[in-house]
Amino acid sequence: MPGNTFGHSFRITTWGESHGRALGVVIDGVPAGLPLDTEIVQKELDRRRPGQSAVSTPRSETDKVEIISGIFEGKTTGTPISMMVWNKDADSSSYDNIKDLPRPGHADYPYMEKYGIRDHRGGGRSSARETIGRVAAGAVAKEILSIFGIDIIAHVTELGGIRAKEMPFDTIKEHLEKTPVRCADLEAAQLMLEKVGKAREEHESIGGVVEIIAIGLPPGIGEPVFDKLDADIAKAIMSIGAVKGVEIGIGNEAAQMKGSQMNDPFILEDGKIIAQTNNAGGILGGLSTGMPIICRASVKPTPSISKVQHTVNTKEMKNSDIIIKGRHDPTIPPRMVPVAEAMMALVLVDHMIRSGHIHPNSLLKQ
């Protein structure tokens, strides 16, 4: 199975399945000299782990990370970093009776068609638990970026049709973890919570929108044509399970605008060239402008719902019905927040290295 590696100069390979013994990641291209320990990585993993609130699956996993290689005396050595998390609370019993019934909205059917075999326990490799490796690697990327004044935050801006008000970066950062839905607009967050509760009562699920913002990126980061910064960001975010659409800046609204409305005029402020507006989302021609990078991801409702759905029994080759039991998230966006931040961080650190802003071998040579 190819396609498990992401990045160019800063590369990650994730491995493991939802109900396997463990999951993890190998990171290649981390410069030497970065102070790093398990506490830094664990902090990010704790943000994505299940069983923390009513808006997530009740599966109880501690997701304690072990750093296997690449660290000596508290600093990275420049060699590959390997990290792993043991699965402690995998319960496969609810999947055994549906192993021949492809779940609507899941990757079961195309996996079977492509490989002729699949791990039916919790979705195997296509499970959201695959993102453990992404978040662990993203924690490392975030640490590197912080040295250069780059900060990333993601938050839920829409859930079940409830939209949050726009807020400044600092307010989002302050309010983000005050509510289980990770929405900085606390009034909207309460309505979102009610929507989640209603969906759970109705054996349903709801989708939403996650916005990712990165500030502090210098202008000129990215590669033109096929390795454009926005193209790589879109690929990174689109690779997260359940994401069905990605927008950069004003996004789809650009199609209804005039050029005079869409263009971001440049002005000189304190000796620096900045844009008066940021419809472009901080990227022009595939290169950063120095303005905040803004990206939004449209996330579908959790496909695992406890309602009768039509499917096909692939063993008997006849139409059938399926009711999905087990422990599932009623909504995905709140738990996707740290995953989205991680993927943005991975793209940005990769391009910072490629552009020469970060030394590829050692931070001690900056």
Swiss-Prot record:
Chain residues that bind FMN: R125, S126, S127, G285, K300, P301, T302, P303, S304, R327
Cellular component aspect of the GO annotation: cytosol
Residues binding NADP(+): R48
Record's cofactor remark: Reduced FMN (FMNH(2)).
Bridged cysteine pairs (disulfide): none
Any one GO molecular-function label of the UniProt entry: chorismate synthase activity
Keyword Flavoprotein: yes
PANTHER family referenced in this protein's UniProt entry, alphabetically: CHORISMATE SYNTHASE (PTHR21085:SF0)
UniProt-recorded name of the protein: Chorismate synthase
